[in-house]
């Protein structure tokens, strides 16, 4: 059996079982023709072919030759058995059965529902605020006894210098004596009128003999 035939047979079986469970008309083929043949001739023809193939081509289901989409077809295609419930289903509004179950049984009706309590909120302070979110702060009640004087702060005492004053005076005297003993520097010995134009001569003494230890240490780290 091909996969297409298998799914067609499964679809046909499911449609038959669903129809027999929900409808009492007794003939699912007449039901299918009634719903499809008058509006969609191609779908009805396909259903007719499937039915004839499932019947092994040996049984006649009462179909009269003619155009399935034409109103002048078989009587089984255009008429319904007297016990069919299809007309009631066609004229019945959708979800009419469930319209009364949209609300829970304990939900009161609109007339019985209690009106909501409306509380008017004003941005201005009320004259007699009964319930107010931001009440005006009021002074707390104080006793009539005189207020206790505040305790005086401790006077600030400057810390005593750890260096004796005599030692500081002696250091100042030595610095002054050393400053007076130095000879006055003569600018003429260092600079001249042509010092800016003189050629610049350098010697090895002008450079630092030992390199920076930090720089030397960094260079050593890079050596492998």
Swiss-Prot record:
Disulfide bonds listed in the record = none
- Regions of biased composition (Basic residues) lie at 139-156
Q: Which Pfam families match?
A: TT_ORF2-like (PF02957)
Q: Where is this region: Disordered?
A: 128-224
Q: Where in the sequence does UniProt note compositional bias of the Low complexity kind?
A: 185-195
The UniProt entry, under InterPro entries, shows: HEV_TT_vir_Orf2/Gyrovir_Vp2_N
Q: Where is the composition biased (Basic and acidic residues)?
A: 167-182
Q: Where is the composition biased (Polar residues)?
A: 129-138
Source taxon at top rank: Viruses
Protein name (Swiss-Prot/TrEMBL): Uncharacterized ORF3 protein
Q: Which organism does this sequence originate in?
A: Torque teno sus virus 1 (isolate Sd-TTV31)
